[in-house]
Amino acid sequence: MRRILQGLCAFVFLFALAFPLQDVSAKPMYFDDAQNYLIWDTGTHHGSAVDLSSAVVVKDTPEYIIIAALDYFVTYDKSAEYPMRSKNTVYFKESKQSAHLYVTSDFQNRYQKGEWHKITNIYTSIRHAYPILKERAIQNTKNIPAQS
């Protein structure tokens, strides 16, 4: 019996070495097939997605960059009556010196009050989504025609 258990453990160990699991958490997730609604905050049943076509650079200084985008509540239950609902505008602030990332929204005027939440966990989905959001915001802002 002991040899069977040792053999089974060896098999499982070698199998794990031969077929390592992929790190799926490092891949950005999208709510739609067109990859326009990027999920930046997620749970098991629902999350938040930003509309990449709405992302723009609001402020760009030597100290930080602020990006705004329309934010949506998304539910992963496809049978839900409204799988996607508009929430508000979400703002991301990146410190250029420290690379710290902060988030706030229009909800309860938090952006206007200057209330920012620092993202401390490097493994959150926001860390994987932010570079994509930033790239699109810069691209979208360049495409805005100058007003005369």
Residue ranges and their predicted role:
Residues 1-10:
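Bacterial N-terminal signal peptides that target proteins for export
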Residues 23-86, 95-148:
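N-terminal secretory-pathway/extracellular module detecting exported/lumenal segments
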Residues 90-91:
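Beta-strand-enriched accessory nucleic-acid recognition/scaffold domains that flank the catalytic cores
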Residues 14-23:
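C-terminal segment of classical bacterial N-terminal signal peptides
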